[in-house]
């Protein structure tokens, strides 16, 4: 059914954007501060 092709791509685009936004929020709230804290603690320990 060729008339459904644009809706398929629109659906894929919508879920792709939702996935990107979710990943961005997850990384900015949870993973990146954890990595930064690990890096700062290693830096602090090596300065001792």
Swiss-Prot record:
Family, as annotated: Belongs to the ATPase protein 8 family.
Pfam families xref list: Fun_ATP-synt_8 (PF05933)
Record organism: Saccharomyces cerevisiae (strain ATCC 204508 / S288c)
Superkingdom of the source species: Eukaryota
GO biological process assignments: proton motive force-driven ATP synthesis
Localization per Swiss-Prot or TrEMBL: Mitochondrion membrane
Protein name per UniProt: ATP synthase protein 8
Role according to the record: Mitochondrial membrane ATP synthase (F(1)F(0) ATP synthase or Complex V) produces ATP from ADP in the presence of a proton gradient across the membrane which is generated by electron transport complexes of the respiratory chain. F-type ATPases consist of two structural domains, F(1) - containing the extramembraneous catalytic core and F(0) - containing the membrane proton channel, linked together by a central stalk and a peripheral stalk. During catalysis, ATP synthesis in the catalytic domain of F(1) is coupled via a rotary mechanism of the central stalk subunits to proton translocation.
Membrane topology: Single-pass membrane protein
GN (gene name): ATP8
């Amino acid at each position: 059914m060729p008339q459904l092709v644009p809706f398929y791509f629109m659906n894929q685009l919508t879920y792709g954007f939702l996935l990107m936004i979710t990943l961005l929020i997850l990384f900015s709230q949870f993973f990146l501060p954890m990595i930064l804290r690990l890096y700062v603690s290693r830096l602090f320990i090596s300065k001792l």
